Swiss-Prot record:
InterPro entries from the UniProt entry: Cyt_c-like_dom, Cyt_c-like_dom_sf, Cytochrome_c_Peroxidase/MauG, Di-haem_cyt_c_peroxidsae, MauG/Cytc_peroxidase
Keyword line: Heme, Iron, Metal-binding, Oxidoreductase, Periplasm, Repeat, Signal
Gene from which the chain derives: idrP2
GO molecular function, one term: electron transfer activity
Ranges for domain Cytochrome c: 48-158, 201-346
EC number: 1.11.1.5
Induction behaviour: Specifically expressed under iodate-respiring conditions.
Protein's organism: Pseudomonas sp. (strain SCT)
Chain positions recorded as heme c 2 binding sites: 216, 219-220
Subcellular location: Periplasm
Quaternary structure, from the entry: The iodate reductase (Idr) complex is composed of a molybdopterin-dependent iodate reductase (IdrA and IdrB subunits) and two associated peroxidases (IdrP1 and IdrP2).
SUPFAM superfamilies from the UniProt entry: Cytochrome c
GO cellular component: periplasmic space
Signal peptide: 1-27
Name of the protein this chain belongs to: Cytochrome-c peroxidase IdrP2
């Protein structure tokens, strides 16, 4: 996908290879030099809860019309996204943002592109997506009743806790499963632990640029390469959001339900402003993580860039309209080195097989 300079200038921000130098971050009082970090050891979860959450994640009965599951937009075979620029959302609707990977959710400070949900509460993320009309459109009470009529789920539930299936705990189980999904065996992690042969010389040069000349590390740091903050880098609008009435309707409804003033006059994705109502947040989106980029194209909050080369070229020009970034002045070879480095942050594909939907069996409540 090609974009003229005005659009191209907007996109590297949501994906976030920012041009602010690391020294600027230090000057802002952040102390020691920022850097990426290897993935930490996985936290021990509740095995019974994770198993239930996996079942629910793949079960279409958690959507209003049985048409979609969590895995419909977060497919293990597609990097736990959907491979589309803009998500389809609930059947008969079209969504206005990209479906991000759920990998490494345990390390997110905030969830969703506008950062509206606390990263410490994955159960609320599951509830938000399952009950939202434009994603899965499920009533929590109906969901609870459906799942109670699946004997296999009732048995699994008893392994976890000695009570009946409960709506909020269903969401918590899905959240527990999501937070068990993590990047593993990325070449960069071995390199960061001392194996100098784990990544190529070109990728090592890209890492030096990432921390130095390009200044990407100012916003992309920590184990998943995200500071979890909101930034405006002028990512271009995806034309289909306004050209496709179904996507426009979804966007405007999101604004309306968020209480955004004058929402009917909006003709762009205002980002975090719809949540905060602070005009300084117009066009701001959460810094994307950099893990598993090999599997999660297209990129940015609206999927406007098909390749990492486009992303790097966009940021090299200083971002888009309204961006505070400066051009990176990277040569073609330096841009290629940066892309080579970014790919080292991807681990082995994490494939989880769909366990299938267990049969339902109407519950017997006793004699009439």
């Amino acid at each position: 996908m090609k974009w003229h300079r005005g659009r191209l200038t907007q996109t590297l921000g949501a994906m976030g290879l920012t041009a602010t130098l690391t020294v600027a971050a230090q000057a802002a009082g952040q102390g020691d030099m920022l850097d990426l970090a290897p993935m930490p050891p996985a936290k021990a979860g509740n095995p019974a809860m994770i198993e239930l959450g996996k079942q629910f994640f793949f079960d279409r009965r958690l959507s209003g019309d049985w048409g979609v599951s969590c895995a419909s937009c977060h497919d293990p075979a597609k990097g736990w996204g959907d491979g589309l620029a803009l998500s389809k959302g609930y059947p008969s609707m079209e969504y206005f943002r990209n479906s991000p990977t759920v990998l490494n959710a345990a390390h997110r400070k905030r969830f969703l592109w506008d950062g509206r949900l606390d990263g410490a509460d994955p159960g609320t993320l599951a509830r938000d997506m399952i009950t939202e009309a434009h994603t899965m459109n499920m009533d929590g009470r109906l969901m609870q009743e459906r799942l109670q009529q699946v004997p296999e789920y009732a048995a699994l539930w008893q392994k976890w806790r000695n009570d009946d299936i409960n709506g909020m705990r269903v969401f918590n189980a899905v959240g527990e499963f999501i937070t068990s999904l993590e990047t593993r065996n990325a070449p960069f992690d071995d390199f960061a632990k001392g194996d100098s042969t784990a990544i190529t010389k070109e990728a090592q040069h890209g890492y030096a640029l990432f921390k130095g000349k390009a200044g990407c590390v100012s916003c992309h740091n920590g184990p998943i390469g995200s500071d979890g903050k909101l930034h405006k880098t002028g990512v271009p609008e995806h034309p289909d959001v306004l050209n496709n009435p179904l996507r426009t309707i979804t966007m405007l409804r999101h604004y309306a339900t968020s209480g955004m003033p004058n929402y009917m006059s909006a003709r762009s994705d205002v980002g975090a402003y719809a949540i905060s109502k602070d005009e300084r947040d117009v066009g701001k989106f959460q810094t994307a993580q950099l893990r598993d980029l090999k599997y999660t194209a297209p990129y940015m909050h609206n999927g406007v860039f098909d390749t990492l080369e486009e992303v790097v070229a966009f940021y090299n020009q200083g971002g888009g309209e309204g961006s505070a970034l400066s051009p990176l002045t990277l040569s073609t070879a330096e841009q290629q080195a940066l892309v080579a480095f970014l790919l080292t942050l991807s681990g082995d594909p994490l494939i989880v097989e769909d366990p299938g939907q267990p049969d339902m069996q109407p519950r017997v409540f006793g004699k009439n």
